[in-house]
Amino acid sequence: MTVEELKALIRTVPDFPAPGIQFRDITTLLAHGEGLAATMRHLGEAARLAGAEAIAGMEARGFIFGAGVAVELGLGFLPIRKPGKLPASTIGVDYDLEYGTDRLEIDPGAVEAGQKVVIVDDLIATGGTALAAAKLLRQAGAEVGQALFVIDLPELGGAQRLRDTGITVDSLMAFDGH
């Protein structure tokens, strides 16, 4: 399937979760077997070209796409979790949200020093979560130079924020608005 055909599988829900927001709902893409498989192939090819040695994804939808890309390439998957979800010792990073803060954690033993890790997630908006994930992976010893997203919302500036830290950003599709 082409990227335009994949884009047509994304449902837009107006005024969710608040008035004026155009929510880009990936569940319609996830439910479409051929579309989901094509998405993994497109993202997998980009990760392969980036020289990925492992794939990382953030809870929760990053697990779907990140694990799929890892399987596509025969690579390991590094889950980046919310606090208190990993049974082993963890390292973490706090990051700012619009109203407060949050935290991401990883098992540092899962990351090999110098390993080329590509971050994969469903959507990039402001980039806060992806920036925190990159910081965390680097803290664990990984080399992070690439992040892949199904959807970019360029008006929110997240992709540029990642680029400003030296991370190459690729997205399958972009949508105007929030």
Swiss-Prot record:
One Gene Ontology term of the molecular function aspect: AMP binding
Is-annotated flag, keyword Membrane?
A: no
Q: In which pathway does it act?
A: Purine metabolism; AMP biosynthesis via salvage pathway; AMP from adenine: step 1/1
Principal localization reads cytoplasm
Xref: InterPro entries: Ade_phspho_trans, PRibTrfase_dom, PRTase-like, UPRTase/APRTase
- State the PANTHER family in the record: ADENINE PHOSPHORIBOSYLTRANSFERASE
Q: What is this protein called?
A: Adenine phosphoribosyltransferase
Organism of origin: Erythrobacter litoralis (strain HTCC2594)
Gene encoding this polypeptide?
A: apt
